[in-house]
């Protein structure tokens, strides 16, 4: 496991074991979550989201199931904003 919150593109690709073109194709198809904007010219993927997708693949989930999971993961990002307000 890692203590990182984000993976940059290369690390995210390595952790999914996908080629670069496949990685971005999966994002376009909704099979991987889109990146989070980290700065003006930097993006990253939440480690927890990449791990969740990998677990779903290991469990043999269908592409339809994974698309639903991606939607849930992206929607749950708004909780970070809500948690920040409560601190």
Task: Indicate where each model-derived feature is located.
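Basic Lys/Arg-rich amphipathic helical interaction modules
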Residues: 1-17, 21-22, 47-87
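Surface-exposed, Lys/Arg-rich phosphate-binding patches that contact polyanionic backbones
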Residues: 15, 35-36
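Residue-level detection of the helix-turn-helix DNA-binding "recognition helix"
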Residues: 28-29, 55
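Short Lys/Arg-enriched helix C-cap and helix-to-coil transition segments
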Residues: 36-42
């Amino acid at each position: 496991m890692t203590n990182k919150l984000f993976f940059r593109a290369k690390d995210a690709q390595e952790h999914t074991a996908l080629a670069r073109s496949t990685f971005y194709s999966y994002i376009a198809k909704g099979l991987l979550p889109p990146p989070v904007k980290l700065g003006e010219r930097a993006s990253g993927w939440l480690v927890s989201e990449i791990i969740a997708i990998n677990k779903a693949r290991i469990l043999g989930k269908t592409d339809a199931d994974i698309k639903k999971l991606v939607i849930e993961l992206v929607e749950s990002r708004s909780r970070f904003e809500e948690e920040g307000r409560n601190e």
